[in-house]
UniProtKB/Swiss-Prot annotation:
Its cofactor is Zn(2+). Keywords: Amino-acid biosynthesis, Cytoplasm, Lyase, Metal-binding, Methionine biosynthesis, Zinc. This is Methylthioribulose-1-phosphate dehydratase. PANTHER family: METHYLTHIORIBULOSE-1-PHOSPHATE DEHYDRATASE (PTHR10640:SF7). Pathway: Amino-acid biosynthesis; L-methionine biosynthesis via salvage pathway; L-methionine from S-methyl-5-thio-alpha-D-ribose 1-phosphate: step 2/6. The active site is at 151 (proton donor/acceptor). The lineage of its organism: Eukaryota, Fungi, Dikarya, Ascomycota, Saccharomycotina. It comes from Vanderwaltozyma polyspora (strain ATCC 22028 / DSM 70294 / BCRC 21397 / CBS 2163 / NBRC 10782 / NRRL Y-8283 / UCD 57-17). Its EC number is 4.2.1.109. The gene is MDE1.
Amino acid sequence: MTERSFDSFEVVENGLTEEQILQNPDCLISSHDENHPANVICKLCEQFFHNNWCTGTGGGISIKDPKTNYLYIAPSGVQKEKMKREDLFVLNETGDKCLRKPSMYKPSACTPLFLACYKLRNAGAIIHTHSQHAVMCSLIFKDVFRISNIEQIKAIPSGKIDPVTNKQIALSFFDTLEIPIIENMAHEDQLIDSFHDIFKRWPHTQAIIVRRHGIFVWGSDINKAKIYNEAIDYLMELAVKMYQIGIPPDCGIGEEKRYLEMPM
């Protein structure tokens, strides 16, 4: 490849041939558009590091480019607050061909899990964090995280479709948010069977908690995935605090008084 500054590469557009990509794979990650997947992943990884969700190289993000359907994936072993566009992997739409790989890093062990979310959940983006709130909830709850009657629940879709607008119906204040919990394994790619099982038994879930590990959250695009992740983390933190003062997170409205009146 000829010597050129990184920002001088042309932005990839629909219709770019594989030969062109092969000659200049960095065109897939070069863009001044703040909404380009390469830029969004780097920005969010830094933000999630400062949120204490992706420290010590933990966690990851993958985004499907809505223009090309190429899959952008954060690598393994990179400090998230220092991630650069050059660090990213780019796969084709089906995930069976690597179009661009960094020189220094290995593929994320989460890659098979991300691909399963794209294929079986029609996801547009997946966020994986090592949130302490997720880990704490995985220790408090047995198989399913539950929290009820909290305003922030309304940020999460119910899985139901409005017959008039044909849009997702959100959970209501009076609903219970449920997120399945699976057991952790030695390596993240070994979680794939558990993911497939959850996809069959929980067709409408937007997240999976991995015990003593963290959480995976997905959405139809990165904006929705980010909203769901933030809302769920808020609810998990609240659930832990409720548990600490003796209130079941899924208790009914007004029932908290009964638990607060009980001797500690």
